[in-house]
């Protein structure tokens, strides 16, 4: 196995990124596989997929088509497809790509080593997209040299069943990891240099994990426990649901400074009528109340959200209400997309009566408003001193470094290699469309 190499391509959410890292750890540390950045050098190609939107799903088959050429040159090459498309489509993937060897689900990635061996032995395709009792988290192997920031999944799945969303069908019902398992993972990461933890879950604030004595731990209490771990200086979490963003979570913003002043809280629409069609479990007033309560505790917190544009039945008035919500709350970051019907969801049965041209027009208007809000926030930061966690070398200029502010802004600057992994003070000197520039400011003793 020492000469075996794997190449993993990941699409989709941060949970997929976490899963890909877990796949890498399992295959490398327990089974001797080495990562390669060149698919031409790999013995196993793994595609970790997303099915949230139609275009993302089609990208999978385009990518598989490119890998088919590598398979033709090397018949022993193993191609594996995992993630949400794999769970949703199952063996139907073979109909469009019969050269695929393995199909595994979001909850069966820990079986991948055995599936690879089975393909090698029997020369037949293998499929496992079940939701097994054995949790994949039991197979975590911690990286020896992690980055200074790390994702940690605390729960998976969703019980909300919004009418547009495929996630409950591809990730299953909500399952919370035991508290001790999470704390052990974070403590281990901290001991190896991680200073910022990003807690993950499809509905992260619905976390209800068990303690060692069988008690249920709420999300707010988990945050307290994570904050108590030595070496962890920043805590982020994604993705929250307004329905369960309760007062005990809101109060954490006053209690724990390690919780960053940045919140991603998807609302999807500014219209109560559309929210009902989406089967969302909150109203606009309830959403505003949550944000305003947090703003009283953290006046400088920045809000990010999700918006679906052109949901079936969305009128111009509904859309204008969405724009007004963005203005009222100064939302300055978003994941905003044109509605894409997912087969098998209740919304796919609704009449899609908004033209593509109109959807594109509305999306442009909304994203322009968001960009304007981003510029406004960035201008407020110009000249300020920001505490930045230095993550590594800048992608655009390897001679420079980059870090992230507490409110999730990327800052590029000139600095020394030994700054990586440290918190430093940067003066914001310039604003760019997607990042900031800064200059190093020595701390006063």
Swiss-Prot record:
Domain MTTase N-terminal positions: 4-121
InterPro entries: Elp3/MiaA/NifB-like_rSAM, Methylthiotransferase, Methylthiotransferase_CS, Methylthiotransferase_N, Methylthiotransferase_N_sf, MiaB_methiolase, rSAM, rSAM_horseshoe
Catalytic activity: N(6)-dimethylallyladenosine(37) in tRNA + (sulfur carrier)-SH + AH2 + 2 S-adenosyl-L-methionine = 2-methylsulfanyl-N(6)-dimethylallyladenosine(37) in tRNA + (sulfur carrier)-H + 5'-deoxyadenosine + L-methionine + A + S-adenosyl-L-homocysteine + 2 H(+)
Chain residues that bind [4Fe-4S] cluster 1: 13, 50, 84
Cofactor section: [4Fe-4S] cluster
Transmembrane regions: none
Ranges where the Radical SAM core domain occurs: 144-376
Assembly and oligomerization: Monomer.
Protein name, per record: tRNA-2-methylthio-N(6)-dimethylallyladenosine synthase
Gene symbol of the encoding locus: miaB
